[in-house]
Amino acid sequence: FTTRIWLDCARQGRLAGRAMADQPVMPEDDIPFYNASIIYDTFYSYIGEPHGADGNVYLWQGRGGYRKVRVVEGCLAGALLLKERQGANAIRLAIGEDVSAYGDAIVRPDFPWNDLTGQDWDYLF
């Protein structure tokens, strides 16, 4: 499992390097928080801001897994995925995208996140 904290470490390294070289922060550096790891025997992904008082929260439980997706003003705000983590990289790249047309379908593990983002992100790592 190669992405445990690599994405956040790489982002922090880019930001630190630019700060040391007095270079401005680039817009692509403003990407949502992403952490994926293992707690005991459970793989998880924490993406963006899945917790908050505003917006709609969609929950899914099944096959021993849990998925929570939060949408604020029609745009994807964050997700918490336990065991059933299909689409985690695509969800990370879809943060801020308008997902209002999909309703509660976006919380299901079989939701076509790769179609929404236009690339097959699940096979990059």
Task: Name the predicted role of every residue range.
Residues 1-89:
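Mid-to-C-terminal Rossmann-like scaffold of FAD/NAD(P)H-dependent oxidoreductases
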